[in-house]
C-alpha cells in the first residue's frame, strides 16, 4: 500500500519502464545471483523455474509490473472504471494458481498497491484526526492481543497470498471470500499504522523507503542462511526464533547506516551509484 502511495500519477510508460529497470530489475538481477549462491551453499542445488523466484525477490518484480499497470490510470476513463474490478478479479483468480508460481502475488497484492495510489492520499487528512488516531491505537493493540492469544488457531499461510485454494483446503467460493477478507483486514491495519505516523514525518516516508530497501534486500541472504542452515542444525527452534527477533532491530539499523549503504550501493542502487562515479 505504501509502495503505491508514492507513485506519481500520469507518468509516461517509457519513463516508468526506465525508472523501474534501474531501481528494481537491476537490483533484482544482482540479488537473484546472490541468493542462488547462498542457497547452493546452505541447502544444495536451488530450485529454479519460470515464475518462481528466490525468497523475497518477488516484491521487486511485482513492484515493477504494478508501476506499469497503473500508467493508464487517469488517462483513459474506460480504464479508470475497470481498474478496480480487474484488480479484485486478479486477486480472486490468483488463488487458483499453485504456490510454486511465486509471481502470483503480483495479482494478489495489486489491490493494496492501487489503494495506496488512488485512495490513501484522499484519506490522509482524515487519518490525522485525534479520534481516528486513538481508534487506530486501540485497533492495533487489540489486533496484537487477539493474534497473540489465538496464534495456534490461525493459518498464517493466508497472509502470504501465494497458496492456492486447493493447497489451503478450500473451495473457490470460500477461498475467494477469505482471500478478500485477509486483503481488506491488511489494508485496515496498515491504515491504522499510517494514522499514527507523526504528520511532520509523512513527507520523509518516501526517502525512508529508499533506505529500507537496503534492509529488505540485505536481509534476504541472511534469512536464507538462518532457515536452511542454522535452524536444521539447532535443537531448539524457539531459541533461534527469539535470538533472531532480538537481533533483527540492530541488524536493520546497521544495514541502513551510511557506511553500509555506501558499500552496498552498487548492488542496491546501481543507477545512483553510476551517477555518483566521477566522469574523467
Where are these regions (language model features)?
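Alpha-helical transmembrane segments and their immediate juxtamembrane cytosolic regions
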Residues: 1-280
Amino acid at each position: 500500500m505504501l509502495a503505491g502511495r508514492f507513485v506519481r500519477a500520469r507518468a509516461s510508460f517509457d519513463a516508468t519502464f526506465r525508472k523501474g529497470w534501474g531501481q528494481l530489475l537491476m537490483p533484482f538481477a544482482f540479488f537473484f545471483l546472490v541468493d542462488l549462491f547462498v542457497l547452493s551453499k546452505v541447502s544444495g542445488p536451488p530450485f529454479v523455474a519460470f515464475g518462481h523466484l528466490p525468497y523475497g525477490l518477488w516484491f521487486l518484480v511485482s513492484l515493477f509490473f504494478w508501476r506499469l499497470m497503473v500508467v493508464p490510470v487517469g488517462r483513459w476513463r474506460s480504464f479508470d472504471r475497470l481498474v478496480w474490478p480487474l484488480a479484485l478479479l486478479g486477486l480472486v483468480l490468483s488463488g487458483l494458481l499453485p504456490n510454486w508460481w511465486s509471481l502470483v502475488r503480483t495479482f494478489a497484492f495489486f489491490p493494496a498497491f492501487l489503494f495506496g495510489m488512488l485512495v490513501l492520499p484522499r484519506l490522509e487528512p482524515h487519518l490525522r484526526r485525534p479520534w481516528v488516531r486513538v481508534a487506530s491505537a486501540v485497533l492495533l493493540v487489540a489486533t496484537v492481543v487477539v493474534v497473540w492469544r489465538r496464534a495456534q488457531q490461525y493459518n498464517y499461510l493466508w497472509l502470504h497470498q501465494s497458496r492456492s485454494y486447493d493447497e489451503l483446503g478450500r473451495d473457490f467460493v470460500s477461498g475467494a471470500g477469505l482471500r478478500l477478507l485477509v486483503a481488506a483486514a491488511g489494508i485496515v491495519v496498515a491504515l491504522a499504522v499510517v494514522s499514527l505516523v507523526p504528520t511532520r514525518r509523512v513527507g520523509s516516508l518516501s526517502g525512508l523507503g529508499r533506505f529500507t530497501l537496503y534492509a529488505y534486500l540485505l536481509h534476504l541472504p541472511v534469512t536464507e542462511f538462518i532457515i536452511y542452515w542454522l535452524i536444521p542444525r539447532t535443537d531448539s527452534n524457539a531459541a533461534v526464533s527469539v535470538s533472531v527477533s532480538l537481533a533483527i532491530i540492530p541488524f536493520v539499523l546497521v544495514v541502513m547506516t551510511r557506511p553500509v549503504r555506501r558499500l552496498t550501493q552498487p548492488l542496491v542502487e546501481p543507477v545512483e551509484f553510476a551517477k555518483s562515479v566521477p566522469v574523467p
